[in-house]
């Protein structure tokens, strides 16, 4: 197994000697057959080896200085034996295999995913991977879930289109979300750094096979549909229910097997990976919440209260797409709409919040365009996300028109637009619900409004486009309940569980 070599890696974390006995006790409980329905496996690092352990077997592996992996021990079945990227691709295939058992699941790039996580000094002692079926609504989860490196939860859509992109349609290939930043930089023609990379810590690769170097866009406009199941999105495009995203696919390429998110496959860790090209274990935004051993404090980054300041936890020296653009064109203008990972951007929604100058926020979503009132009335999250996304479109349209809130702006060389509705709807209703489909239609309409504004500005033909999600979304099984924390507490194991997956022993 190999992995793309990464930038300079931190010392990282592995189980300390004083916690070995506690780790063994925790593993004995987590891998017991009674928890097998809700626990796929546990990932850890000890004795300078990475390990994946399940109830029926384990594998240990090491990484060399070139980023290559070697398996050094296997007992029973290797839980990470299937790292294919094409499994359950296509909506019909996914629906025919809902809630796959771990022995039937795939875990793309699993060795690299495990290693990058434990490259962080803030990594947990044990990372528990939920089963695909596990429904943990009793612990704050949802019908639709993500976080695992199981393929449906890890698989996000990726569309690259417009000027400078080959017209290939849907291709039977996979990418990684960390490929996004270097690909956008290459598409724009950003000058690489002396080491040949586009950002300081680059774990991804520029997807040059789908780019047309004979053409160079003047602008890249990127959209993120948070938490979108790629099979659902591509199917709706094919059936004419998402015509604007379908238009982008017709103008370029969609990765039919998706773009794999980084472990943990959660929001802010992967927003940051997309924009910086680095894995969470390298850029520092390790999860939506984690424990900082150095301060003895919990860190929460993915909340309304902490979004504006979440990038304070970035590893020093991390760069973004915005930085790559400015290094090549110092006078270029870039904009980040509704995106917490806004480092290097000239315009940022969350910079308004940091300055106490909050943009206009509608009181409610009723009567707003591209809003399905059937769901905004009964669903608080659908309502809130519709308001947030409408506010984002208002900012994007103002920037493209040249003026927002009476301030003039040039056309951005790079414009990033984050939409939240799909995540809210696919969590609440599940990815295969009518609520989920409505969220895709609403978000597609908002993309259409931005495309229309670009046409009115006269720059459409000079634009390239990228559309991704930060992770996938998998429907859990409401009958598959359970809580490993109860079992750990009953056995007297002293462990702090952050984000319901990261176990810190003795904390």
Where are these regions (language model features)?
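Metal-dependent active-site segment of extracytoplasmic phospho-/sulfohydrolases and closely related
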Residues: 1, 37-46, 50-53, 124-129, ...
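Active-site nucleophile/metal-coordination loop of metallo-enzymes that catalyze phosphate/sulfate
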Residues: 1-9, 208-212, 230-324, 340-348
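Active-site neighborhoods of enzymes that stabilize oxyanions during catalysis
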Residues: 2-166, 317-318, 498-507
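A short beta-strand-to-alpha-helix junction
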Residues: 11-25, 167-182, 194-201, 263, ...
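Loop/turn elements at helix/coil->beta-strand transitions in domains of secreted/extracellular proteins
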Residues: 37, 122-124, 216-221, 251-255, ...
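Polar, surface-exposed loop/tail segments
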Residues: 44-49, 190-218
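Structural recognition of the beta-strand scaffold that forms the well-ordered cores
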Residues: 127, 159-160, 220-224, 247, ...
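Active-site His/acidic residue clusters
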Residues: 340-358, 362-368, 376-377, 399-445, ...
């Amino acid at each position: 197994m190999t992995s793309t070599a990464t930038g300079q890696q931190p010392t990282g974390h592995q189980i300390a000697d004083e916690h070995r006995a506690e780790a063994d006790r925790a593993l004995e409980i987590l891998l017991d057959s009674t928890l097998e329905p809700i626990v796929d496996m546990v990932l850890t690092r000890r004795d300078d080896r990475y390990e994946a352990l399940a109830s029926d077997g384990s594998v240990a592996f090491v990484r060399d200085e070139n980023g290559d992996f070697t398996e050094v021990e296997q007992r029973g079945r290797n839980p990470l034996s299937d790292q294919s990227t094409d499994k359950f691709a296509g909506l019909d295939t996914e629906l025919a295999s809902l809630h796959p058992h771990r022995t039937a699941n795939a875990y793309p790039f699993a060795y690299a995913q495990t290693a990058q996580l434990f490259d962080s000094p803030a990594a947990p002692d044990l990372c528990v991977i939920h089963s695909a079926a596990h429904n943990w609504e009793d612990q704050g989860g949802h019908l639709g879930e993500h976080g695992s490196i199981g393929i449906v939860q890890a698989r996000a859509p990726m569309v690259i289109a417009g000027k400078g992109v080959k017209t290939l349609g849907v291709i039977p290939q996979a990418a990684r979300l960390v490929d996004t930043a270097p690909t956008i930089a290459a598409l724009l023609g950003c000058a690489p750094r002396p080491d040949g990379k586009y950002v300081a810590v680059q774990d991804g690769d520029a997807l040059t096979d789908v780019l047309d170097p004979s053409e160079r866009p003047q602008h890249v406009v990127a959209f993120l549909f948070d938490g979108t199941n790629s099979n659902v999105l591509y199917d709706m495009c094919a059936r004419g229910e998402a015509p604007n995203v379908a238009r982008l696919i017709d103008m370029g390429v969609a990765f039919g097997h998706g773009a794999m998110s980084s472990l943990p496959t959660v929001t802010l860790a992967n927003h940051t990976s997309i924009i910086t090209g680095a894995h969470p274990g390298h850029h520092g935004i390790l999860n939506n919440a984690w424990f900082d051993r150095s301060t003895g404090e919990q860190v929460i980054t993915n909340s309304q209260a902490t979004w504006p300041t979440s990038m304070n936890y970035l590893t020093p020296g991390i760069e973004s797409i915005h930085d790559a653009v400015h290094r090549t064109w110092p006078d270029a203008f870039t904009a980040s709409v509704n995106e917490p990972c806004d480092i290097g951007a000239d315009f940022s929604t969350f910079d308004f919040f940091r300055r106490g100058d909050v943009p206009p926020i509608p009181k409610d979503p009723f009567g707003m365009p591209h809003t399905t009132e059937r769901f905004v009335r009964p669903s608080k999250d659908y309502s809130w996300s519709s308001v947030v996304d409408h506010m984002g479109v208002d900012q994007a349209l103002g920037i493209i028109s040249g003026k927002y809130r009476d301030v003039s702006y040039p056309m951005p060389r790079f414009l990033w637009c984050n939409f939240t509705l799909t995540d809210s709807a696919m969590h609440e209703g599940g990815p295969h619900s009518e609520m989920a489909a409505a969220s895709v239609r609403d978000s597609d309409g908002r993309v259409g409004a931005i495309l229309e504004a670009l046409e009115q500005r006269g720059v459409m033909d000079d634009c390239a486009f990228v559309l991704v999600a930060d992770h996938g979304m998998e429907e859990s099984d409401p009958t598959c309940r359970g809580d490993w924390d109860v079992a750990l507490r009953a056995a007297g194991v002293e462990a702090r569980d952050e984000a319901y997956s990261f176990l810190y022993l003795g904390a």
